[in-house]
Amino acid sequence: MKIAIPKERRPGEDRVAISPEVVKKLVGLGFEVIVEQGAGVGASITDDALTAAGATIASTAAQALSQADVVWKVQRPMTAEEGTDEVALIKEGAVLMCHLGALTNRPVVEALTKRKITAYAMELMPRISRAQSMDILSSQSNLAGYRAVIDGAYEFARAFPMMMTAAGTVPPARVLVFGVGVAGLQAIATAKRLGAVVMATDVRAATKEQVESLGGKFITVDDEAMKTAETAGGYAKEMGEEFRKKQAEAVLKELVKTDIAITTALIPGKPAPVLITEEMVTKMKPGSVIIDLAVEAGGNCPLSEPGKIVVKHGVKIVGHTNVPSRVAADASPLFAKNLLNFLTPHVDKDTKTLVMKLEDETVSGTCVTRDGAIVHPALTGQGA
């Protein structure tokens, strides 16, 4: 079987869905690996390194994709309306595995059905123990949380750790993290390593212990409401108006003392909740920084702008998009390993063919299109 990895064409995307290590694993499984020329440049992965691992380099995307049985990408393929029609380049009946953004990008899903492409949206991977090694959201969010702190430290005009000198003492930076998921936990850990005093808030009561285990202080809002603020899949629920008001009041007491606020709160399939209002920004210290990791989903702060750094009311608000791509050299191998871990159990060792087992919940939970039809319950109206 042939597996192809094209160059990512969406603006600002430096990641690639392959690494030399994963090429070797795929070859060992019986795959012929075809990578588009220059696909790994943004992630510091050279064509020579991929060739040495066993891959074949194709000069164009069309050459790489035209005969491939399986296609790996980081982001969803582009449609004709977006410019280069990547969907049309994929062989009819092929298998696609990528971050499809299926719940919010219906046009590309419909375009895939027309070519009878079996598409797996890796962002829909079930939150079960067995699937942790396949979870692209966790691997990429972890790096985003790290990078958020580094970006915050860069934009902040002061030092992070406390420094005692003959000329005086420099106080430690105060960091406030909103949302204690994978990104939030890594942000807490990284900020603590840099010497900051770290506070954190989340609607889920279970995150309090996690925050404290990393040396942070948890801001409690409403104990009773927080006990039911988590979905069966482990995600945060959208909270009511009364809770949000209480949360804003509790957080504001810390926000006025905060140097760097990092917001990471997302609700699957819905706009990001507003956690820092414009009124709250006006009460922050001059020179403080907000890093909004949810800017692509509408933002946790309404003043953040996708892809821009703006200054409002004396506060610098950073809206970098696609933050994992800012750590592409580490993000790419992890993404590729997630895809490999998803694919490997379904390769028949005797025939060297890919047979996706539909009874496997990692398969049924991520399969969006099959046999020319949209099959995922969240898109057919049969489930959430």
Curated annotation (Swiss-Prot):
RQD loop: region residues: 126-136
Residue positions binding NAD(+): 127-129, 132-135, 180-182, 202-204, 234, 247, 266
Outcome reported for the amino acid change (mutating S138A): No effect on interaction with PntB, but hydride transfer strongly inhibited. No effect on the binding affinity to NADH
Disulfide bonds: none
CDD domains recorded: Rubrum_tdh
UniProt xrefs under Gene3D superfamilies: NAD(P)-binding Rossmann-like Domain (3.40.50.720)
Listed result of changing Q132N: No effect on interaction with PntB, but hydride transfer strongly inhibited. No effect on NADH binding affinity on its own, but differences in NADH binding properties in complex with PntB
Keywords: NAD, NADP, Nucleotide-binding, Translocase
Record GO biological process: NADPH regeneration
Catalytic activity, EC: 7.1.1.1
Single GO cellular component term: plasma membrane
Pfam families, A to Z: AlaDh_PNT_C, AlaDh_PNT_N
InterPro entries per the UniProt record, alphabetical: Ala_DH/PNT_CS2 (IPR008143), AlaDH/PNT_CS1 (IPR008142), AlaDH/PNT_N (IPR007886), AlaDH/PNT_NAD(H)-bd (IPR007698), NAD(P)-bd_dom_sf (IPR036291)
Reactions that this protein is recorded to catalyse: NAD(+) + NADPH + H(+)(in) = NADH + NADP(+) + H(+)(out)
Family of this protein: Belongs to the AlaDH/PNT family.
Function as written in the Swiss-Prot or TrEMBL entry: The transhydrogenation between NADH and NADP is coupled to respiration and ATP hydrolysis and functions as a proton pump across the membrane.
NCBIfam families per record: PRK09424.1
Complexes and interactors: Heterotrimer of two alpha chains and a beta (PntB) chain; in Rhodospirillum, the alpha chain is made of two subunits (PntAA and PntAB) and forms a dimer.
Listed name of the protein: NAD(P) transhydrogenase subunit alpha part 1
Organism from which the protein derives: Rhodospirillum rubrum (strain ATCC 11170 / ATH 1.1.1 / DSM 467 / LMG 4362 / NCIMB 8255 / S1)
